[in-house]
Each structure stands twice: as C-alpha cells, then as structure tokens.
Amino acid sequence: MWWFRRRDRAPLRATSSLSLRWRVMLLAMSMVAMVVVLMSFAVYAVISAALYSDIDNQLQSRAQLLIASGSLAADPGKAIEGTAYSDVNAMLVNPGQSIYTAQQPGQTLPVGAAEKAVIRGELFMSRRTTADQRVLAIRLTNGSSLLISKSLKPTEAVMNKLRWVLLIVGGIGVAVAAVAGGMVTRAGLRPVGRLTEAAERVARTDDLRPIPVFGSDELARLTEAFNLMLRALAESRERQARLVTDAGHELRTPLTSLRTNVELLMASMAPGAPRLPKQEMVDLRADVLAQIEELSTLVGDLVDLSRGDAGEVVHEPVDMADVVDRSLERVRRRRNDIHFDVEVIGWQVYGDTAGLSRMALNLMDNAAKWSPPGGHVGVRLSQLDASHAELVVSDRGPGIPVQERRLVFERFYRSASARALPGSGLGLAIVKQVVLNHGGLLRIEDTDPGGQPPGTSIYVLLPGRRMPIPQLPGATAGARSTDIENSRGSANVISVESQSTRAT
C-alpha cells in the first residue's frame, strides 16, 4: 500500500526532431533519388552518344557512296543535286573552277575554318557540330572537296523527349520509394510504437503488464528485454510493498508494548500517583531497554534488507577468514557460554564486505541462540574445488523440521518454537539475500541425523579463489589447532593455513 499521496506525473513531451519513420522515409527517398539521377545521366549520355555517332556514320556512308559511285567525277552537278532528295546538305568544291551545292529547304551548309582548311588541302577530313548541324568535310584525290551536313533538330527533339521521360519516371520512382518506405517503416516500427505506448502507460498508471511478442527479429528481442525489465520492476515493487507491509506489522507490536510500558512508568512517576514496587520498577525498565534493543535490531535488519534489494553494494576482494573471525568475536561477546569450534581457510570472495559479515554473523547468532548453555557451535570454511568454498555453521539445538527449512529463509517467518526467543525473523532472510547476491547456494541439514536433538547445519556455497599463503619464518606445514581461553569464554580454532592459529 502507499503511505504517501502519489503526485500526478507530467505527460511525456514530444521532441521537435523528425520521427524515425520520417527519417527512414527521407533516407529511402534520397537513396532512390540518387540512383534515379545517376541512372538518368547514364541513360542520357549513352543514348546521346549513340544518336550522334549514328549521324556521323550516316554522313560517312553517304560520302563514301558518292565517292565510290564515280558520279562526282563523271557528272558532279547531277551527283550533288541527287542528294537534295535525302535529308542531307551537300557541296562539291573544285578550287578555282566551280562549286556545286544541294541544300534542304530552310537550311544552309555552313562553311567554317575547318572546312576551309580541308578545301585548301591543309586537312584530309574534318567533323564538327555547328548550332544545329553536323558537318563532314573530306578532301578527294582529284583536289576537290566534298562537304556534307545533316540537321540535328530531329536528334535534339528525341533527346528533349528523353529528358522528360527520365524526369517523369524518376519522379514516379521517388514517390513509389517514399510510399513503400513509409509502409515498411510503419510495419517495422509497430513494435517500437507498442514499446513507447507501454512505457507511457507505465509512467501514467504504473501498469506493468507485459507486451505481446511477435516474430524473432531484433525488435522482438527488444520487446522481450522490455518485458524482462517490466517483470523486474514489478518484482521490485512487490518486494517494496511486502517489506513495508511486513515492517509495519512487525514494528507495531514492540512499539505498542514499549508505549504501554513508558506510559506506565510516566503514570507511576506523576505527583500523587501510587508508586510501583521497586522490583516491578526494575523489571519494567529492563523491559523498556529490551524493547528498544529489539526495535534497533529490527530497524537494522530492515535497512540491510532494503539495501540489498536496491543493489547498493560495493564489490571488492574480501577475505572470508577475516570475516569469520570478526563475526565470531561479536557473537562471543553476547554468548560467552558457547564453545566455538572453528576451522577456516584463506578464501577470497569478490563481493560486499558488510553483507558477507552480516551473513556470517547472522548464521553464528542463530546457531548460538539455539544452542544450550555450554554447547558447541561448529564453524567450518573449506575448499570444494578451484573456484568454490563451503561455509558450514552447525549447532546441537532442536533442529529444523524438513517442511520448515525453506520457510525459515522467508522474511519475518518465525516458527512456533522461535516466537518465545528474541529475534526479528529477518536474520536468515538476510543470509539468503546476501548469498544469492554473491552467486552462492544455501541448504539445511541435520547436524546429527537421527540424533536427539538432531541439531542444524547450514551450508553456504561461495564462489571465489584460494588466498595466497604467505611464507613466514619457522612456519611448518600442516594444520594446527589450539584451545584458547579468555575472560569471556573459549573457542576451538583450527586454521588450515598452516602458518598461524586464529585466536578468537
């Protein structure tokens, strides 16, 4: 449930840049337009070269026909006059004698510098294009010169029509490309539109329903990734809501009891009020302190849980042997009547120092809580393979029934027998959270299967690597064990590191 009123979210603002759909359409149009322009230039150049080459071939053929027929020598006037019935202009020049011409209506065969050079005998042949004609001049063997020209207007008319055809076809191609690009883009971006609508729906309404996935392309994978994000967000919100609800429920009981005791103390100290007996006053104050301690523990556990849920951890190399030592020292301050049998190796885990320390502390606290006075708790950290080690914390308590072993790691779960003991029901939940966040595994077994009591052993599998063993002067190989006594109790510490004995 929400404790605070949720403020309305501002609608998402549209960006001023072009949409992806329009950009894809413009890209398709640009590419097609570029191809059309290049193809049009190529087609125009090829056809133009072919038409003008054909005109040159026609002029050359007509000249060769006149020369080969011998008519220019036998009857030049009649030969030149015969060309008037075709589509060419002709001129035969006999220097110092005569000039014969035959021209099409409205046309004049142009005589320029190139043609004059042929007539003077300076050139054997020339070709050139004037304003609207193609002119061929050839020097004959008898000293005369033959000039033939053809109008370019029909060719230019064809090229002009070709330009219009290419322009129209290119425009149609660009338009078709734009329409096709728009249709393809619309179909291709439909999943993106669904993702956008889903994101806006989440922002407006907190609706975390998954989006249907169609196909198996990149957009389908993007949709699946978005659905995974929605599921993770839904699970996170569910955890937050459950944590807030459970915390409110768990805090209500100690707060109510604390309030009652404080009110009773204040009432007994009011002027004229009857005084409580001294022993009852002492017990009442002790209850208040115990309830404050219980609240502090509960709040600390809640902070650790929320910190783990939010992923606010710093990963660094952690020596689990040091973690076990520090945690053991704290537990023994609270339970100096318990004997701890410790066997550890140097094992490095890349993870959160605070979280791993809290995990080890909670396991030892739980084992000590269920152990009778003077009992033994075993703590063993051993290597299983090159990349995994196992931390085992064992007690000789009443054990955990098989049907409850999965439940004890749930938040605020407390069995019927555990409700009479101090605790928040969050200790093993924190252990589970830390272990899973570090890629580990958990399991529970009986310490003494079939025994009475069977006891409980919690196994934690942790990935990592073996710590390098420093070579100390006078060190000998092999494990050493020592029983160390101090003012608060004893612990049997077995160090597999062979160089030192860990005193706790």
Curated annotation (Swiss-Prot):
Alphabetically ordered keywords of this record: ATP-binding, Cell membrane, Hydrolase, Kinase, Magnesium, Manganese, Membrane, Nucleotide-binding, Phosphoprotein, Protein phosphatase, Stress response, Transferase, Transmembrane, Transmembrane helix, Two-component regulatory system, Virulence
Transmembrane segments: 27-47, 164-184
Induction: Induced by MprA. Induced by low concentrations of sodium dodecyl sulfate (SDS). In strain BCG / Pasteur, induced during growth in macrophages.
GO molecular function: ATP binding; phosphoprotein phosphatase activity; phosphorelay sensor kinase activity
Top-rank taxon: Bacteria
Residue ranges of domain HAMP in the record: 186-238
Stretches assigned to the Histidine kinase domain: 246-466
Pfam families, sorted: HAMP, HATPase_c, HisKA
Disulphides: none
Catalytic activity: ATP + protein L-histidine = ADP + protein N-phospho-L-histidine
Gene Ontology, cellular component aspect: plasma membrane
Residue numbers bearing the Phosphohistidine modification: H249
Function summary: Member of the two-component regulatory system MprB/MprA which contributes to maintaining a balance among several systems involved in stress resistance and is required for establishment and maintenance of persistent infection in the host. In response to environmental signals MprB acts both as a membrane-associated protein kinase that undergoes autophosphorylation and subsequently transfers the phosphate to MprA, and a protein phosphatase that dephosphorylates phospho-MprA. MprB/MprA up-regulates expression of mprA and pepD.
Protein name, per record: Signal transduction histidine-protein kinase/phosphatase MprB
Naturally occurring in which organism (per UniProt): Mycobacterium bovis (strain ATCC BAA-935 / AF2122/97)
